[in-house]
Amino acid sequence: MDNRPIGFLDSGVGGLTVVRELMRQLPHEEVIYIGDSARAPYGPRPAEQIRAYTWQLVNFLLTKDVKMIVIACNTATAVVWEEVKEKLDIPVLGVILPGASAAIKSTASGRIGVIGTPMTVSSDIYRQKIEALSPEMQVESLACPKFVPLVESNELHSSLTKKVVYETLQPLAGRVDTLVLGCTHYPLLRPIIQNRMGPDVKLIDSGAECVRDISVLLNYFEINRSREKQELNHQFYTTANAKSFSEIAESWLRLKVNVEHVSL
């Protein structure tokens, strides 16, 4: 048993999609979350900058004595997950490999689409992971640079967002039977994405898939939190406006959250 919290980091609010799934599957675990909304999106930034920012978030979580870190950001996972995993003595998970594995299991045609930030797509990491596991798969990747700013602005249901999503996803329409949401912000746009792609296209939420791996590692290292009834003290931090962050967090998680502003 280990009653310390699990640390989550993201470029902004996107990682909350992973936290929501964790709270559904592992409701007894405690969460500390840091979202770097002041510097979002990470996707267009150079790799060295993403690496530096991610390490700042990692080091912040380490000051909170977390027992595990989840890099709940595809861009940061693509750039620096391997490095962080090797340097820390606690488990560190990323969100890409779980999403790649789930896509392979889902597809019937072998035609998989991946949408993500410019950095995630240019890294080609999803195609590499998918083809390493199943070489016969055909992967089409598409950068969606406008999606994260829309989510960070809480423009989840506007006519502008629908227009942007429909136009951006045009190149993949009718070409794949499985679509990996290769950015943890994207599930917040899931209804619009599903409508654009059609009901027969299976959407893979890479962050939600990651929670299954979290559960496996908690069991493997015997660091599950005690299941005895006790009050959880979830903590949420943002580098941007705490009120804006809490509005999105409370809507998505369906619970009252206290959000603190931090400067890194």
Curated annotation (Swiss-Prot):
Top EC category: isomerase
Keywords, sorted A to Z: Cell shape, Cell wall biogenesis/degradation, Isomerase, Peptidoglycan synthesis
Reactions catalysed according to its record: L-glutamate = D-glutamate
Any one biological process term the GO annotation gives: peptidoglycan biosynthetic process
Active site: 73 (proton donor/acceptor), 183 (proton donor/acceptor)
Xref: Pfam families: Asp_Glu_race
Keyword Cell wall biogenesis/degradation: yes
Known function: Provides the (R)-glutamate required for cell wall biosynthesis.
Annotated family: Belongs to the aspartate/glutamate racemases family.
UniProt name for this protein: Glutamate racemase
